[in-house]
């Protein structure tokens, strides 16, 4: 009997009259044809749903339907979490054990309740065997349960102790971090004040440089009596006023130095006149408090009244006493910078000399240092000395090139004068560092200043490293000279070194005319 085809398959065959290719592996018999079934029964008994018993039908109605107190309400996840945490936090605090007595009482009550429950369970589940075994089992169960409860309580106590320790550790960490932050803030303020103080001292040094240049122009001892005789009372009054002003300036500078030395505990011995402490190190907080109390008692160093003749010896003694603190401070910061930079013991670092050895080595050649301070580096004229006469320039004829007089190199550095003090090289170095520091902290929005700084950096880079074209050697690159554009009727400027005859020979050799000329000359 032919199988009835579904309607969809019949319609598809009508719409597509092309005959379908038969599958050679398909089974024409319906009984033996492979087919897919929903479930294969292997003989297992199906567990049908059991009907509800009559006892369940007689059960009371749910409390949710009868009592409104047990009815629920819609809520959001966020509100549920907040209510959940609000409920769990007080419950955890209620479980805390106030003291040891209360904990022991609670443990005993919990053990009694558990033992009663175990006895009831044993009475309900009695086994009709030996009576002694029942008693032994119940006692063993009671002991095991009591041990488990004690272990649980001990574990809770340990967890509470760990939480307390963690909270204490968090407090210590927070306090430690707060102390660290406050220390860093204080260090930053100290560095800022130190930079401001350095800028003020440098500003005073710049103002004193003008006075130094004026002092170098004053008459020297060999001609000073002549100026004094010819100057008269006007010169004497001006000399007296300048002497008073100079004395007041020296007194102010000495007071400023003593005030700065007295404020710092490590240099206070210089003002008091006591011996320095060789084992002086960084001051602790307790020492700072003592120093603050002493400062309140004595806020200023003692005033000194010195005459002009006493200042040279006083400053020499002060400089010698300051050497101990200077050497100790230089060595300390030199070691710190070496450790911070990581250059200690690497390469030739073991052969490096200490900073104090280098300073002593430089100070050994005192004659050279004195000559550097007695060298006239600026253009000024000392009163009482004749002006330097420039060398006459030889006259040149109209057709001859102009010849300049030959001046030896560094001639201005050979102008020595023992009566002057000139440190323009050190002064210019200070100015250069000041300008670099000021320009490094420019406003990024100031495009003009940033452009100037960028040009200065580019100049320094071009001096440090020059661009070299390594491919231009051995004739691998064509060399040429760019001529400037001609303006209006301007004649071209010939920059080549070849003359007309050389050009003629070049062109003749290129086009083969040179050989013909040689042949004509030979005939």
From Swiss-Prot:
Q: Where is the composition biased (Basic and acidic residues)?
A: 30-40
Q: Which residues carry this modification: Phosphoserine?
A: 62, 167, 237, 280, 284-285
User: InterPro entries under this entry?
Assistant: AATF, AATF/Bfr2, AATF_C
Q: Residues annotated as region Disordered?
A: 13-172, 273-305
Stretches the record annotates as Binds to TSG101: 447-523
> What is the role of this chain?
May function as a general inhibitor of the histone deacetylase HDAC1. Binding to the pocket region of RB1 may displace HDAC1 from RB1/E2F complexes, leading to activation of E2F target genes and cell cycle progression. Conversely, displacement of HDAC1 from SP1 bound to the CDKN1A promoter leads to increased expression of this CDK inhibitor and blocks cell cycle progression. May negatively regulate the pro-apoptotic activity of DAPK3/ZIPK. Can act cooperatively with TSG101 to stimulate AR mediated transcription activation. May negatively regulate the pro-apoptotic activity of DAPK3/ZIPK.
Query: Oligomeric state and partners?
Result: Binds PAWR, POLR2J, RB1/RB, RBL1/P107, RBL2/P130 and SP1. Binds DAPK3/ZIPK and TSG101. May also bind MAPT.
The family classification in the record reads: Belongs to the AATF family.
What protein name is recorded for this chain? Protein AATF
Q: Which organism is it from?
A: Rattus norvegicus
Tell me the name of the encoding gene: Aatf
